[in-house]
Amino acid sequence: GNNLAQVTPAPIDLPVVGVVNDFYEAREGMKVTFVDSLTVSEYFELARFGQIELFEGGRPRQFTETAPPSVAGYTAHLEALSRRRVIVDDDDNGQNVSLNDPNGSQFIYHPTANGGFSVGTQGSDFFRGGDLVSGLTGVLDWSFAGASGTDAWRIRPTAANPATFTVANPRPATPPAVGGAIRAVGMNLLNYFTTIDTTASTGSGPCAPDGLQD
């Protein structure tokens, strides 16, 4: 039978001390509990892979928001984040699993035990960045999310101990005042080329607006 409920979880207190991989490898496959309150901070891969990232000590800031640009400083910043990060995974390596509800609406849910999804805490179908998870319990696992290059340490919540989200960053009822008029502008920096007319092609010509490769 399944005796997982009889196992006493090993406590983990973040940030990790020592080598992160060594720390987690010594606990791989174990049922663990994080003693810290963790903050929902990253959910870019939620819809694709069914995973979110939680951090001890609050939501992390961009390095240059609190420090001047520095290669060494940024490296240390990433190292510090790796000691505070927890990936909660839905234990389903399928990509872009359909999240449509029976009524045809598409919702984004937070991952829970057994590869499923459930409703969030701020309404019928979502959580927000900044919400909290306390007493996170699950099986520690090293695996990929569903695509190559995504190997990482992950927590798989169990049916007996699903992740519970507490509202800590409620959605404002009305947009906050910005203190004046603003003008929004945008620029496509992903295609901001300085060599658009330079090409190694001998037959297609340059990539200019009137070129054959546009």
What are these regions (language model features)?
Residues G1-Q213:
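Extended non-catalytic accessory segments flanking core domains
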